[in-house]
């Protein structure tokens, strides 16, 4: 059984390894895409927003389908749809067609989330927090490797589209692999996030309280890493005068920080630290990091802050879903879809809002705006932490 669970999880983790690339692939190829579609960086940010719009349109139905027909069909379908996006973008002759492919990427992402997170919770009920956080680990590795692949293609004067075609090919192969695997049955009651005991609540969790706080955290956690992934290189160019090639490397430092964080969480969540504490600690770290980044514009400091931004935004969304499925376990797929809908709203609104701010000539103001989002996330996490302690009667 354990071997079967690991094989099934590995197929889902492969999906997320390449989703890590997908999340930054448009921003990382901004120069090539602006020329191909005759647009500007703000236009690319709107295509990125279309991915979030695709997620928003389908997260609700994806969550319901996950509970109705099972996790496997959604996970398999997501890989196929994502491959279509990756092949379609470099071949798109127009901005409008690219927008359609971006919508498909959002559909794929929603299906992937609604199928994968509940499945991991059911595969590893005594370590669901660690299993879900490892999703972010694989995404971070993929995101860290993509800039290296793009640099390799540029150095060898190769078509930028190969950075899209390689993950597309692996997604297609993964469909075959996933189709041979067994997925868990639905509606098993989970154990406490990353703990060995079943959750024992002193009172029934209230969706209007704990659920609302988790939805807010789902929004802010996605907003924080969305802003960094799109605008961190541009901010470094404007604030510290870094060259374009050097500024893109900040995304690698960001991804390394993310990877370090989730590997640490994968160990700590199963032994010493409860997920609810991380949802409070990490936004506080983000606040401190943004404060330094906004006031100190030395290149080496930006490298360090990029690392800590990646570190403090990594895994929070995954932990949020783990907590939501723990507190409201009877509808794991549905509540996953609700949190993911909040996340998709952030994926839509943040590229649009920050694109407008950038167009007004204030990239520094983007990260001041980001600081405000971190404040909201911290407040929601503090409320959740307080409520969780009351529900469990334990030191969270």
Curated annotation (Swiss-Prot):
Compartment list: Cell membrane
MF-aspect GO terms: transmembrane transporter activity
Annotated CDD domains: MFS_YdiM_like
Transmembrane regions listed in the UniProt entry: 8-28, 44-64, 73-93, 97-117, 133-153, 158-178, 213-233, 250-270, 276-296, 304-324, 338-358, 363-383
Pfam families, A to Z: MFS_1
GO CC, one annotated term: membrane
The organism's place on the tree of life at top rank: Bacteria
Membrane-related topology note: Multi-pass membrane protein
Gene3D superfamilies: MFS general substrate transporter like domains (1.20.1250.20)
Keyword vocabulary terms for this entry: Cell membrane, Membrane, Transmembrane, Transmembrane helix, Transport
Signal peptide start and end residues: none
Family according to the record: Belongs to the major facilitator superfamily.
This protein's name: Uncharacterized MFS-type transporter YfkL
Origin species: Bacillus subtilis (strain 168)
């Amino acid at each position: 059984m354990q071997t079967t669970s690991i094989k099934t999880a590995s197929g889902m983790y492969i999906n997320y390894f390449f989703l890590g690339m997908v999340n930054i692939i448009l921003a990382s190829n901004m120069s090539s895409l602006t020329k191909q579609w005759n647009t500007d960086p703000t236009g690319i940010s709107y295509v990125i927003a279309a991915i979030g719009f695709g997620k928003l349109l389908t997260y609700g139905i994806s969550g319901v389908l996950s509970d109705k027909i099972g996790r496997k069909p959604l996970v398999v379908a997501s890989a196929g749809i994502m491959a279509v996006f990756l092949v379609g973008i470099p071949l798109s002759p127009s901005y409008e067609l690219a927008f359609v492919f971006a919508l498909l990427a959002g559909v794929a992402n929603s299906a992937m989330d609604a199928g994968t997170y509940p499945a991991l919770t059911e595969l590893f009920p005594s370590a669901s927090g660690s299993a879900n956080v490892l999703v972010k680990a694989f995404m971070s590795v993929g995101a860290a490797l993509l800039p290296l692949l793009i640099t390799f293609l540029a150095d060898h004067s190769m078509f930028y589209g190969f950075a899209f075609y390689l993950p597309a090919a692996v997604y297609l192969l993964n469909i075959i692999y996933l189709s041979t695997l067994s997925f868990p049955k639905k509606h098993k009651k989970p154990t406490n996030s990353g703990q060995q005991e079943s959750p024992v609540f002193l009172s029934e969790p209230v969706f209007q309280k704990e659920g609302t706080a988790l939805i807010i955290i789902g929004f802010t956690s996605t907003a924080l890493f969305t802003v960094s992934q799109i605008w961190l290189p541009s901010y470094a160019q404007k604030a510290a005068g870094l060259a374009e090639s050097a500024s893109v490397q900040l995304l690698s430092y960001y991804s390394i920080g993310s990877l370090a964080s989730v590997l640490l969480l994968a160990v700590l969540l199963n032994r010493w630290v409860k997920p609810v504490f991380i949802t409070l600690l990490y936004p506080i770290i983000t606040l401190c990091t943004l404060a330094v980044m906004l006031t100190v514009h030395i290149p080496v400091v930006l490298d360090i802050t990029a690392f800590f931004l990646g570190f403090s935004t990594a895994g929070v969304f995954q932990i949020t879903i783990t907590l939501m499925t723990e507190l409201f376990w009877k509808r794991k797929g549905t509540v996953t879809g609700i949190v993911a809908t909040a996340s998709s709203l952030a994926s839509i609104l943040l590229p649009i809002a920050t694109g407008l701010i950038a167009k007004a000539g204030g990239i520094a103001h983007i990260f001041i705006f980001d600081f405000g989002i971190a404040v909201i996330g911290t407040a929601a996490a503090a409320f959740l932490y307080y409520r969780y302690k009351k529900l469990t009667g334990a030191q969270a």
